[in-house]
Amino acid sequence: MATRSVLLALVVLNLLFYVPPGRSGPNVYIQKIFASCWRLQGTCRPKCLKNETISYFGVILYICGCVNPKYLPILTGK
């Protein structure tokens, strides 16, 4: 009886973790949120574009915070 329950649990877990090959991965909107930073105005990429500045460093090997300067707050003081 116990082995039957364990086998059933393994089958159910296997089916829960199965991802169909045609449409695997997170949806486009979720990818956009997780690949962005600075209140969704910046992006994480290996190098910033010419008109962007680095606001902070994030994930290793990626610069997280490539933001257009018009979205950055005005700095006060030195």
UniProtKB/Swiss-Prot annotation:
State the source organism's domain of life.
Eukaryota
The protein's UniProt keywords, in alphabetical order, are: Antibiotic, Antimicrobial, Defensin, Disulfide bond, Secreted, Signal
Q: Which cysteines are joined by disulfide bonds?
A: C37-C64, C48-C66
What's an example Gene Ontology biological process for this entry? Answer: innate immune response
Q: Where is this protein localized, as stated in its record?
A: Secreted
One Pfam family, please name it: Defensin_beta_2
Cellular component (GO) terms are: extracellular region
Q: Which InterPro entries match?
A: Beta-defensin, Beta_defensin_dom
Q: Where is the signal peptide?
A: 1-24
Q: Does the keyword Secreted apply?
A: yes
Protein role: Has antibacterial activity.
Q: Please state which protein family the record places this protein in.
A: Belongs to the beta-defensin family.
Name listed for the protein in its UniProt record = Beta-defensin 135
- What taxonomic ancestry is recorded? Eukaryota, Metazoa, Chordata, Craniata, Vertebrata
Gene this chain is encoded by:
DEFB135
